[in-house]
């Protein structure tokens, strides 16, 4: 079984830029701001250090979150409506979950989530 390759700083940076392009497609202002922030963070930590592998891993994880969990909404203005409506741009990379926790919570069961725990560590 082959080990997962560890990306270089340049590879992580390019992965982050691709993720911003996917997540913020059509929103030039946010796309530009996200890319500027990524560049600023990489420029600030240009020198190799003890924490370089952690920073590279952080960039890879950030790219994954941007690509799979960020959904943008565009405000749709229809004449005659009193409420605000948004059209969501859901693309093929968005992580789609199941509704198992909603179904079990609807049966008088409470899903407990402790502070500091992730969804994968919850107990029902």
From Swiss-Prot:
InterPro entries: Complex1_LYR_LYRM7, MZM1/LYRM7. The keyword Chaperone applies. It comes from the Eukaryota. It is found in: Mitochondrion matrix. Its main location: mitochondrion. GO terms for cellular component: mitochondrial matrix. GO terms for biological process: mitochondrial respiratory chain complex III assembly. Keywords: Chaperone, Mitochondrion, Transit peptide. GO terms for molecular function: protein folding chaperone. Assembly factor required for Rieske Fe-S protein RIP1 incorporation into the cytochrome b-c1 (CIII) complex. Functions as a chaperone, binding to this subunit within the mitochondrial matrix and stabilizing it prior to its translocation and insertion into the late CIII dimeric intermediate within the mitochondrial inner membrane. Modulates the mitochondrial matrix zinc pool. Belongs to the complex I LYR family. MZM1 subfamily. PANTHER family: COMPLEX III ASSEMBLY FACTOR LYRM7. Interacts with RIP1. This is Mitochondrial zinc maintenance protein 1, mitochondrial. It comes from Blastomyces gilchristii (strain SLH14081) (Blastomyces dermatitidis).
């Amino acid at each position: 079984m082959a080990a997962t390759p560890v990306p270089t700083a340049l590879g992580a940076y390019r992965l982050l830029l691709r993720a911003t392009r996917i997540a913020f497609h059509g929103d030039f202002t946010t796309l530009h701001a996200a890319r500027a922030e990524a560049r600023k963070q990489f420029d600030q930590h240009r020198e190799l250090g003890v924490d370089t592998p952690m920073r590279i891993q952080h960039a890879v994880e950030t790219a994954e979150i941007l690509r799979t969990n960020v959904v943008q909404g565009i405000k749709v203005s229809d004449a005659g409506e009193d409420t605000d409506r948004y059209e969501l741009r859901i693309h093929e990379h968005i992580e789609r979950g199941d509704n198992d926790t909603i179904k079990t919570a609807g049966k008088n069961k409470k899903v407990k989530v402790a502070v500091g725990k992730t969804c994968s560590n919850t107990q029902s």
